[in-house]
A protein has these predicted regions:
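Condensing-enzyme catalytic core of the thiolase-fold
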Residues: 1-144
Length: 144
């Protein structure tokens, strides 16, 4: 955050909002506002948490990644790549996307990123289902 070079580089490629506010999934989306936040996740083997009688808030059942550093980059997101990695994570976890009622997004607040992400989410969670709605959110808005 404090390095002026990073601020200048992100401004040069057009991802920073001139209003310094992230308008995720909004027609006025014009980039993101830089901000700082901390999220902490404490991981423990499920068997250990049960043994220790810890409150269990969630269980990680599967993960997936598809960024290799060789693709087009952050200014040209791929809906197909996002769709594929989401489907892979669900397959690894043994979960059915139709059982999902809420999806937390990246939510960049950019004209390229938001529609691409929504398209991928729709392809995974809406296209082949009978669902009427899927709640979608992004932590980017309150942080930036």
């Amino acid at each position: 955050m404090l390095a002026v070079e990073i601020q200048m580089n992100t401004d040069d490629i057009g991802v920073l909002s001139p209003t310094s506010t992230c308008h995720t999934f909004d027609e006025s989306a014009d980039g993101y506002g830089r901000g700082e936040g901390v999220g902490a996740i404490f991981l423990k083997r499920l068997s250990d948490a049960i043994r220790d009688k810890d409150p269990i808030r969630g269980v990680i059942r599967g993960t997936a990644v598809n960024a290799n550093g060789k693709m087009t980059g952050i200014t040209q997101p791929s809906a197909k790549a996002q769709e594929n990695v989401t489907r892979t994570a669900y397959q690894f976890a043994g979960l059915d996307p139709n059982d999902t009622s809420y999806f937390e997004t990246h939510g960049t607040g950019t004209q390229a990123g938001d529609p691409t992400e929504v398209r991928a989410i729709g392809n995974v969670f809406i296209e082949d289902s009978q669902r009427e709605e899927l709640l979608v959110g992004s932590v980017c808005v309150p942080i930036s």
